[in-house]
């Protein structure tokens, strides 16, 4: 077998491959004994468990990660209108087995609380049982040698132009910000911190040689119990904005790349200083994940044959990321919360959380449907000053239209967050809440098809020639592919087009076609 006269040009194309798409569960169990300086438990207002991923790594075919689960219980004591809060942080280490190796793996870990039950054993003891699910998605880069051109041995090529990620770079960084915050002079001193929350507002992502510069604001919210100057138990909210700017080293990156940067809060601890100065120390942990791509175009060989010899071709199915479309949309969800314990005198705080967010393709609507649930919560007091906690779930759906004239498969990677939550009292016992959801993330278009990774001409198997004829007549139907006709008769598509004075490689109408033979 001799292929010396056949010369091949190749290009290394990179394709994104999913290494892991799985979930695991972690049980959360805590037998909680109150410290001596905490008041007795009369009624639990709310028990929440909040999981956050602290770090992750891949080593020896395993994905390992550390997770912190914060247990926070709000309760009141008998004949006392103060809202008390106890909390405990529990740490876990989990791992997944990975199937196969890929370059530049990108890790997305999404923890969520499945359920939590809090049972009051006695006035000093709580039995807490719950579960957390962590969904892991790991993608990596696989490079495949693809034939882009060939010469000699009467080779005929069918080509297609493709857009592909010439380079794909990933990076992850853990950022810790420690800042001193100051209460407003009009605010009462902090008693007990009842709730903290953090929302990231990205401002700018800039790529320079070997570095990614990311800037933004961390909007921090705090709810705390306090006492008014009249000696009345109450609660106050306070908001702070922490600007941040970080430089992340990424070898090979420059301003020709496009980047998907996602910043996730992994912890927000606020500790009041003991000198009654109104100064608070805030420790904020952020996880930054970045996927950067540089797209390029080339022509690849999708089919081949020789007019002189039999051929062998090795083929592979391709899925090439050809376009990334940034998502920027919003959606509003409303709910009513009714109080069964009398009239609502005041609301200290309202907020909303997202859960069970999924996406699916609706081919009839030609859109992706993002669905999930919003849990609305309020903390306030009834007419006699007793603290109350109300919550309600509202499902939602949002459509993301697919762009017109999309050629290839399309997928979506949404990134949702609650941008704002507002309320008003509809009547004495009902509050109406509205949550504004910001929808970010990316839509990825993949070109799919068959590519040739190896091509051989079998020079010891020449094709039969009939020197008696220079032309054959072929009767064709409308839309027949001239490439397939040329391949069948072992001639060149160029010769057929010239002989029949055609400009298109599809037959426009039924009729007769002259086939020049390669003798």
Feature names for model-found ranges:
Residues 453-477, 510-519:
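Surface-exposed, interaction-prone regions with an acidic/low-complexity signature
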